[in-house]
């Protein structure tokens, strides 16, 4: 600071300009890092039950979440929230799941299913859809149930996957400027 004060005002202005440029470059680099490090995923307000079932409707709200890139985040198509306790201890009520849309999953995988118009998160087995909580029975869909697989559960969202407030502010600014153009 002492050296800065010893400069005449023109040299101080030059130092100020250089510092502003350096700060701007740091911010641009941080923005680029955020864009490269995060994926924007839609969070479907589509209830899926880890319990006795949740009626599905054709309309639902969609909000977006920025998640740190990982194999499961990059494969995911959406985020869906668990309702109920039938998948304890694997999933808890309120857990947010990364889901990849697919009409089929392998035996032993956990998926999102529609049975008779209700959404479920269950483990797929040849004899039906299994809960991990032993107090729930296996769901054995019949042809009249209009049974279908919506997607494969890839992972549960954890705190460390989420953007920090600073990262989120930058990502929201970037996204809003893209949307406005």
Give the residues covered by each predicted segment.
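Charged, helix-prone or intrinsically disordered regulatory segments positioned adjacent to compact structured domains
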Residues: 1-45
């Amino acid at each position: 600071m002492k050296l800065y004060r010893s400069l005449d005002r023109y040299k101080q202005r030059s130092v100020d300009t250089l510092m502003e440029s350096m700060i701007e470059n740091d911010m641009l680099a941080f923005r680029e890092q955020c864009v490269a490090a995060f994926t924007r995923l839609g969070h479907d307000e589509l209830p899926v039950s880890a319990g006795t079932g949740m009626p599905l409707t054709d309309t639902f709200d969609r909000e977006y979440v920025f998640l740190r890139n990982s194999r499961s985040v990059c494969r995911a198509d959406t985020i869906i929230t668990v309702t109920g306790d039938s998948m304890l201890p694997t999933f808890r009520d309120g857990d947010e799941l990364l889901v990849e849309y697919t009409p089929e999953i392998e035996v032993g995988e956990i998926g999102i299913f529609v049975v008779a118009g209700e959404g479920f998160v269950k483990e797929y087995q040849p004899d039906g859809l299994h809960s991990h909580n032993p107090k729930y029975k296996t769901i054995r869909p019949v042809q009249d149930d209009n049974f279908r697989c919506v997607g494969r559960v890839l992972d549960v969202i954890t705190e460390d996957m989420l953007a920090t407030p600073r990262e989120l502010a930058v990502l929201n600014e970037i996204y809003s400027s893209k949307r406005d153009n």
